[in-house]
Amino acid sequence: MPRRFSLKTRLLSLLLSAAMVLMFLPASAFAADDEQVRVGDAWLGSATRVVSCGEGGTAAYDPDTKTLTLTNVTINHDYNAAIWNTVEGLTIKLVGENSINSGDQTGILSMQGCGLLTLTGEGSLNITTADGQAIYANTGSLLIKDTTVTASTEAFDTCAVSADLGIEISGSTLESAIASGNAIYTPGDLKIENSNVTTSNDNQNNKGYPAIWSDGDITINGGQLKSTCKGGTALGAASTISITGCTLESASTGSNAIYTPGDLTIENSNVTTNSAGNLPAIWSDSDITINGGQLKSTCTGSDALGATGTLSITDCTVENKGYYTALYSGGKMTLTGGSITAEAEDNAILSRSAMTITNATVKATAQKYNALRASDVMKIDGGRVEATTFGENIYAIHMQPMDDGSNNGRMEIGGGVELYVKGFSGIFVGEEATIADAHIVIDSDDWSIDMPVKFADGYDIARALGGDSKGSAEPFDWYSMSLEPFTPGTPGTYRYLELLSGAKHTLRVTNGMISELNGKPYTGNEAEIPAGSPVTLTLTVNEDAFTAGEVFSSWTLFPTPRDLQIDGNVITFTMPAEDVEIRATGDIPPEPTPDAEGSPLFGLALGAVGGTLVGLTFYAAHEIGITQTLRETLPAGAAIPANRGELALLLWNAADKPEPEKQPAFTDVSDLETAKAAQWAIEAGLMETESSGKFAPAKRVTRLKVFRTWKAANH
């Protein structure tokens, strides 16, 4: 995709440079020991070890360690390389501020077969050339370690910094700029470790050279990298690119900001890319994997981020804006966790294969076409997804048939996802959509969703609203839409559609039966209800379930739904995400006690006996009178406690759940809230322990006991 500096052109240029160097060298230049490194016009070796370079500057060579120390040197040399190395394994140590101006020649040249060239030291080096390379290791490698180097050249068709066998930059600051060529180039691998690297390529001859290019792998760990390129790739490799823990900015005006035909891996990095041309800002001909960190990629003429193979993004904050797409993959696309904002002129997020979105926050916006588009299977599991399109006659979410015609795509939606869809049309599901637990809102101008839609095993519709708009939407029976048989192209019933589905849980009635469920006759004592469903029940008491002497007192629900309302035998609530037991509880009227006549309910009981409750014993009437008073006294919708645990919870909830002074340590209470309620009630003097270390939460309490305890709590 990108053009790099032609190897043939580069070799020809180097051969000509080498020929010029040889022309100016005397015959003695090839003496082995005395002439190892040339600095300007002076050879350094065993005999001559120090040469003055500029005002107060020195170049000192140690042949034993093969180290050339530059101390505040100024080298102006334009008829061959300013520093020409012939020794294997040379180290150049920088002390103070050093500068090299080599005119039309190479600044530092390490000749063929000299192996590793190392630049290091606490000082700095500034290399400028008019028409040559700044640093070149011929058939060798280059290490820039713990130092500062600036390299710039006005040359065309060459490289500012290059080494044939690989380049490593470690703990250093490197600035490299070129008029038209590669700022950094190696046929080997490029490794940048905890460094601050800045590169630029102006491509003044419009040949499209990359600013940074490796024919091998590029590995960047830590530090910062900023690369800009006019008309070429800003950062590219012929093999793979790995970026870890790095702050990276890469921009191109006519090509890719980042390109590789191999795999691209980005780990815990802050990456910003921009492409103003007609090629993707970030592109891999293979797979892209991004884990953690932040990514912001912009492209005005193509894709913001794309891979021919798979694309996997995990726990990353992504803000992409592209022309064709913000995210593209030819293979499977997986988006897990994190936050993804994707905007594009055409399709916001597009996979030519499957797409899986798991527990991610996704906001996808397309101006012309689809916000989300995939083939095979689109699975949205958990998280929050917003899909919006402004295109005419376009679906916001579209399942595209596979290129080989193997299927028309299908959708799976669940995990409690919140899915919001807006567009001319809502969702084209392909072959079908399977919904588990989800909250789906579709606001369309034409139709909301193409059928068929089914619910996964163990799940069902909890609530459905439909209408021409959100303002006119009303509840409706989902199964009245006559979903089967499916007719291709048949639209959804409503422009505005809101669905809430959930896992089905068991509603079980003990000591009674369901006679009516949500306005329809029902026979049985169990029902499977999806979580989130509004439930209205009419119940019938099974009097035969009570023991001799017991009378019905109240309906008790466990767990107690937050919006529970009880009106006689009619109960309403929203089904929680767990099973619910409804129990008809009865009580044995209390034995006569001396204070029975002193009960505040004594007159009420007598009235009951003299009125509609004729035939009951005095004490039964007394108990029913207490029950009636409790229903009027307790908070609306609260069940009358049947045991000590329920009584403690009633008192504790009414007091706004205060924390007890001591941690509960009951051996017979496993539920944390019940334990706290019991401990608090005992500390408040409203209840007592039953025995050492036990509270006996299941022990029955009479209505009279409930009434007295409730009044004792100043209610």
Feature names for model-found ranges:
Residues 1-7:
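N-terminal secretory signal peptides that target proteins for export/translocation
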Residues 14-24:
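Bacterial N-terminal signal peptides
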Residues 25, 29-31, 588-676, 683-704, ...:
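Feature responds to low-complexity, polar/acidic, surface-exposed segments characteristic
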Residues 57, 79-81, 103-109, 131-132, ...:
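Short, recurring structural edge motifs at helix starts
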Residues 458-479, 534-568:
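Surface-exposed interfaces of beta-sheet-rich extracellular modules
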Residues 495-509, 567-596, 677, 709:
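Conserved "repeat-terminator" motif of extracellular CCP/Sushi domains
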Residues 516-549, 575-578:
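Extracellular modular ligand-binding repeats in secreted and cell-surface proteins
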